[in-house]
UniProtKB/Swiss-Prot annotation:
UniProt keyword Transmembrane helix, yes or no: no
Protein's name according to its UniProt entry: Muscleblind-like protein 1
Organism whose genome encodes this protein: Gallus gallus (Chicken)
SMART domains: ZnF_C3H1 (SM00356)
GN (gene name): MBNL1
Similarity section: Belongs to the muscleblind family.
Entry GO CC: cytoplasm; nucleoplasm
Length: 369
């Protein structure tokens, strides 16, 4: 059965959130500095979001009053990254379809069924340990053989009967974002007596960097690696002691992810050699809901399950020699000599007995399974 993935025109990666302060007319930042969109009157805004003009990204929009947003340079860079992530997702979907087609060719009795997008398990929202496991991320739409899916398409990590405190889940969620630092509240009030190089919290020079939802700033990872060349970077450049803190947090997250992946593989009976290395964190994690972040872990996990299923369905069929013109005495002697070998005792018991030509002529054919 041929498998095809119908290309769907997805505009989610072109979607940007509109600045609420701009809608009220109170935004003090221009459109070239604000991290949210400042659409013109001709743009269509739906539910506080606007779609960017694809032709504008290519520099070929000739419409006089375009109903799509023509983003400024910093938002254009963000959309280009979103577009690359979207292309990677489509490429991996095509590769998965080819793999499932090959698996179906090897197992003709395994029909392929489309799998809709769903959350892996409700307990993952409150399971702090499972938050670091890339193999238990949200499942993207794909094609999976029906028999390797459970009755209810859901994977449960850990013990769902044991509740995890909300504080632990919140701490796990905070540790996932190792590229963020909490802003010093005393510094915001102007009362911090510790310097920028001594305080354990961030002292951003520009208040536009601060995310008002959780009072944090996003760290410039290029600056951490010593390669930020932007003249006016919109991300926070931390001092040396905070850089060490970020690197330590990243190391802890990687170690926790590796330990959780190994524990999950051992619990499910998957050999460690089957699981590929842990995927890297996505390039950007934005809070505007526009990024179509692709998680490759689920495809690696599904491929491991498919390999296990192929191994289970592969049965060993021993060759059945046919001896023509042999007498019953010869056959019994051959059987006796074979069973005298220690390791051949179990093999001869499972094989189909040797049938002579005289037996075929004097008896009917009997099919032995």
């Amino acid at each position: 059965m041929a498998v095809s993935v119908t290309p769907i025109r997805d505009t989610k990666w072109l979607t940007l959130e509109v600045c609420r302060e701009f809608q009220r007319g109170t935004c003090s930042r221009p459109d070239t500095e604000c991290k949210f969109a400042h659409p013109s009157k001709s743009c269509q805004v739906e539910n506080g979001r606007v779609i960017a003009c694809f032709d504008s990204l290519k520099g070929r929009c000739s419409r006089e009053n375009c109903k799509y947003l023509h983003p400024p340079p910093h938002l254009k860079t963000q959309l280009e990254i979103n577009g690359r992530n979207n292309l990677i997702q489509q490429k991996n979907m095509a590769m998965l379809a080819q793999q499932m087609q090959l698996a179906n060719a090897m197992m003709p009795g395994a029909p392929l069924q489309p799998v809709p997008m769903f959350s892996v398990a409700p307990s993952l929202a409150t399971n702090a340990s499972a938050a670091f496991n890339p193999y238990l991320g949200p499942v993207s739409p794909g094609l999976v053989p029906a028999e390797i899916l459970p009755t209810a398409p859901m994977l449960v990590a850990g013990n769902p009967g044991v509740p995890v405190p909300a504080a632990a889940a919140a701490a796990a969620q905070k540790l996932m974002r190792t590229d963020r630092l909490e802003v010093c509240r005393e510094y915001q009030r102007g009362n911090c007596n510790r310097g920028e190089n001594d305080c354990r919290f961030a002292h951003p020079a520009d208040s536009a960097m601060i995310d008002t939802n959780d009072n944090t700033v996003t760290v410039c990872m290029d600056y951490i690696k010593g390669r930020c060349s932007r003249e006016k970077c919109k991300y926070f450049h931390p001092p040396a002691h905070l850089q060490a803190k970020i690197k330590a947090a990243q190391y802890q997250v990687n170690q926790a992810a590796a330990a959780q992946a190994a524990a999950t593989a051992a619990a499910m009976g998957i050999p460690q050699a089957v699981l590929p290395p842990l995927p890297k964190r996505p390039a950007l994690e934005k809070t505007n809901g526009a990024t179509a972040v692709f998680n490759t872990g689920i495809f690696q996990y599904q491929q491991a399950l498919a390999n296990m299923q192929l191994q289970q369905h592969t049965a060993f069929l021993p060759p059945v020699p046919m001896v023509h013109g042999a007498t019953p005495a010869t056959v019994s002697a051959a059987t006796t000599s074979a069973t005298s070998v220690p390791f051949a005792a179990t093999a001869t018991a499972n094989q189909i007995p040797i049938i002579s030509a005289e037996h075929l002529t004097s008896h009917k054919y009997v099919t032995q399974m």
